[in-house]
Regions:
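Extracytoplasmic/periplasmic proteins that interact with beta-lactams or build/remodel peptidoglycan
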Residues: 1-156, 170-213
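Active-site SXXK
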Residues: 87, 146, 165, 209, ...
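An amphipathic alpha-helix/helix-turn recognition signal
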Residues: 141, 160, 220-223
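Surface-exposed patches in mature extracellular/periplasmic domains of secreted proteins
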Residues: 156-162
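An acidic- and aromatic-residue-enriched active-site/binding cleft used to recognize and process polar
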Residues: 162-163, 172-173, 219
Length: 229
């Protein structure tokens, strides 16, 4: 091999190595970041074109995806949205996900590693992937009772099973309706989000988790007060 061909071969080899290295970096190290980028329309359409798993309370859906005729194929809907908003959070086009919708997004979207076999089956059969259902420990009757007891007051109520630690009620007021943030009209979603964000009452703040907003009441204070009397 003469010197010219040898130089060309080396250059071509270096180009292939550079291409292989860059593709490896993208697919292995930055894939999650790119998928999570809000400007990634491919991921956005893919997440809405799949049937997202329901969120259940007492076996009944409080959040589910229903078929639509537009390009997104499914619409996320919330039953008794304001009542369960502190738990479900919201699933939106461009404002991210919160609550269970965010923390268990991998399961609800069907992309969790534990659902790998389901993903392979969907790929081989050509079927649309489907997310897993998530059952909450909330009790609808206790949740409603906590909601009614709080009334128009600002604050939060949490009821916990002392034996298991299961959360039976999770109410925060003022609250919001996640249905207003789950639409497919981007302008309407942004307007609704900005309005909620600008509300001085802070309906987007989950007071059951944000302890700096409302300090928890101490049951022991009742004992001290009784002793003082």
């Amino acid at each position: 091999m003469n010197k010219e061909l040898k130089r060309v071969s080396i250059v071509v080899l270096l180009m292939f190595l550079a291409l292989f290295g860059s593709s490896t970096v993208i697919q292995v190290f930055t894939a999650d970041t790119l998928r999570a980028d809000g400007r990634n329309s491919r991921t956005l359409y893919a997440s809405y074109s799949a049937e997202r798993g329901p969120i259940l309370v007492d076996g009944q859906p409080i959040a589910e995806s229903v078929p639509t005729d537009d390009e997104f194929k499914f619409q996320r809907t919330y039953t008794d949205g304001p009542l369960f908003a502190p738990a479900t959070g919201y699933f939106t086009l461009n404002q991210g996900n919160t609550g269970i919708e965010g923390s268990l997004n991998d399961y609800l979207s069907g992309t969790s590693n534990s659902q790998f076999l389901d993903q392979v089956n969907a790929l081989l059969t050509g079927q649309n992937p489907k997310g897993a259902a998530v059952e909450l420990t909330l009790d609808r009757d206790i949740q409603q009772a906590a909601w009614d007891a709080l009334g128009d007051l600002q604050g939060a109520v949490i009821a916990i099973n002392p034996k298991t630690g299961a959360i039976l009620a999770m109410v925060s007021k003022p609250t919001f309706d996640p249905n207003t943030l789950a639409g497919h009209d981007t302008d309407q979603v942004i307007a609704a989000y900005d309005q909620l964000l600008a509300d001085p009452a802070g309906p987007l703040f989950n007071r059951t988790l944000a302890g700096n907003l409302n300090p928890p009441g101490s049951t022991f204070k009742l004992v001290v007060a009784a002793a003082a009397l």
